[in-house]
Amino acid sequence: MRTLPLGARAFIPVALAGAVLFSLAPSTPAAAATITTEGQQIVQIAKWQLGDPWRYGATGPYAFDCSGLVIYSYKRAGEGAAIRAGSLRSARSIYLYFRSRGKTSRTNPKVGDLVVWGYGSHIGIYIGGGKAISTLRNGVRIHGVFAVTARFTTYIHTGMSTKRVS
């Protein structure tokens, strides 16, 4: 057996250790758990924007206001028609559109439903567990439904929460 001279560096164990670490790494990110509904897909797209800055009127992909994040997430999921993306540009217009069609409720939210605060002054996406994702002044964040300063108004049921991903 050949030994290395004193002070020589051996790179083989380091290379092997690196190979072991890479082989143990998951092939898909843990955050990309199985997505089975359009609502989950919409939430995942919104979560990819976490930390992006707030900018009034911005619709992404690098900055958002509250309705911009909603429109961007729905469009990227292929569901822009669900919120009439383009014709409904503000949180208030989205809220009024769905309210006039009887699609709002203060109970039983589903993942991917919209959350409205202050009668349309702010809007976000329900992610489950009493939490929502929305763009506040400090950027795209996850927060409790009742933690936003504007008063919680309603949930908007867009029908994406149960629509299966094909």
Language-model-detected regions and their locations in the chain:
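Regular secondary-structure segments
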Residues: K47-G51
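Stable alpha-helical elements in mature extracytoplasmic
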Residues: E38-I42, A46, C66, V70-S73
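Compositionally biased, low-complexity segments enriched in small residues
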Residues: L24-S27, G39
